[in-house]
């Protein structure tokens, strides 16, 4: 499991990810960011499972999951950066 933390404009995004055969097998997104409804984060995690661990596929899954969410001080790009940082095994 790789973990990465990314500082967004207003919050910290922490991602834990497990990669199996170039696909996301498990992912956890936590932190002190504001995304409403809160279920949007769970939806993002669900949509990432099974996705190929490439920036384009991660971006598509997150953009779809978070499209209806209200985000304060964080963006889809911030979430993509955090997931890809964890995928690469960086610390942030």
Task: Indicate residue ranges for each PLM-predicted region.
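Generic hydrophobic/packing signal
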Residues: 9-12, 62, 76
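Generic structural signal for short, solvent-exposed loop/turn connectors between secondary structure elements
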Residues: 1-2, 21-22, 54-57, 69
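A hydrophobic, small-residue-rich beta->alpha segment in the mid-to-C-terminal subdomain
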Residues: 24-62
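Structured beta-strand/loop patches that form or line metal/cofactor-binding pockets in enzymes
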Residues: 1-23
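C-terminal structural segments of small proteins and small subunits
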Residues: 64-92
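Solvent-exposed, flexible loop/coil residues
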Residues: 10, 37-39, 78
């Amino acid at each position: 499991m790789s973990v990465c933390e990314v500082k967004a404009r207003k919050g910290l995004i922490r991602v834990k990810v497990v990669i199996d055969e170039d696909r996301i097998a498990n992912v956890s997104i936590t932190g002190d960011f504001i995304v409403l409804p809160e279920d949007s984060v769970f939806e993002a995690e669900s949509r990432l499972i099974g996705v190929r661990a490439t920036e384009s596929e991660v971006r598509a899954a997150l953009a779809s999951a978070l499209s209806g969410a209200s985000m304060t001080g964080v963006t889809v790009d911030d979430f993509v950066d955090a997931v890809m940082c964890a995928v690469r095994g960086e610390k942030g």
